[in-house]
Amino acid sequence: MTKILDGKKIASILREELKQDIITLKERGIEPKLAVVLVGEDPASVAYAKFLQKVSENAGVLFELHQLSKSTAEEEIICKIEDLNQIQAVHGILMMMPLPPHVNKQHIMEHISPLKDVDGLHPFNRGHLISGGICLHPATPTSCLEILKRSGITLAGKHIVVVGRGETVGKPLVFMALAENATVTVCHSRTVDLGKFTKQADIIISAVGKPGLITADMIKPGAVVVDAGIHEEAGNIIGDVDYEQVKEIAEAITPVPGGVGSLTTVLMLKNVLKGIQLQIGTQE
């Protein structure tokens, strides 16, 4: 019988670990704080900020929202970020996306302190991820591997096919999987005969955002399938994988929703705590 990799269950365990780590920090006089910067009033961003506030406060992380108008100049946003960089009581900074068209996302991300970059998207963190250094990792690729490891699935020596080469999931996932001693193949939208490669995989991780991309005839019996794709259709969130068909062949599979996405918020909060350790290290 196919094993369903329950992201919600793993997220619950991670939340308890997070709470215990926060208790330990508070005993040392450290109150973890996350600052969120939101430009404009994008409904999905506003809703996520409210959700994040609830999750943060339930875990014991202080939360503050800095909401700026949609017309705020890029220079003003950068000034706000640099102010937060200088405040020692702020340990993590999250820049909500999307940004207005007049704002350069790359410029903004480059101004967030890499030690407070809970998204793990600063060039410093990207570089250290590639070189194997200590840094903050992006939450979604971390979630993909965490689900596997916490489910008792060995990564070392396995052939992992990553489908997707995006900056936030696919690319970092490749180097994170290599660090786990997996053999990694990368496929993407221009790959010819995608199934030729996925059929060779022990583990498939898809992060494209295209419904039905991974079908049953594209995997070998006994493969593990992790679906990190997100697509909204008729008010429902669906992934890249033809779940009902693939689960009949796969040894293990993540559902959407209830899989990879269930872990991302708590893993981002864990980055706040990891950032604290890095910040303390630079002060000593």
Swiss-Prot record:
Gene Ontology molecular function: methenyltetrahydrofolate cyclohydrolase activity; methylenetetrahydrofolate dehydrogenase (NADP+) activity
GO CC entries: cytosol
UniProt: NADP(+) binding residues: G164, R165, G166, S189, I230
Chemical reaction(s) catalysed: (6R)-5,10-methylene-5,6,7,8-tetrahydrofolate + NADP(+) = (6R)-5,10-methenyltetrahydrofolate + NADPH; (6R)-5,10-methenyltetrahydrofolate + H2O = (6R)-10-formyltetrahydrofolate + H(+)
GO biological process: one example: purine nucleotide biosynthetic process
Alphabetical keyword list: Amino-acid biosynthesis, Histidine biosynthesis, Hydrolase, Methionine biosynthesis, Multifunctional enzyme, NADP, One-carbon metabolism, Oxidoreductase, Purine biosynthesis
Enzyme nomenclature, EC number: 1.5.1.5, 3.5.4.9
The protein's annotated pathway: One-carbon metabolism; tetrahydrofolate interconversion
Domain of life: Bacteria
Tagged with keyword rRNA processing: no
Gene3D superfamilies given in the database record: Leucine Dehydrogenase, chain A, domain 1, NAD(P)-binding Rossmann-like Domain
Summary of subunit composition and partner proteins: Homodimer.
Family according to the record: Belongs to the tetrahydrofolate dehydrogenase/cyclohydrolase family.
Function: Catalyzes the oxidation of 5,10-methylenetetrahydrofolate to 5,10-methenyltetrahydrofolate and then the hydrolysis of 5,10-methenyltetrahydrofolate to 10-formyltetrahydrofolate.
Entry protein name: Bifunctional protein FolD
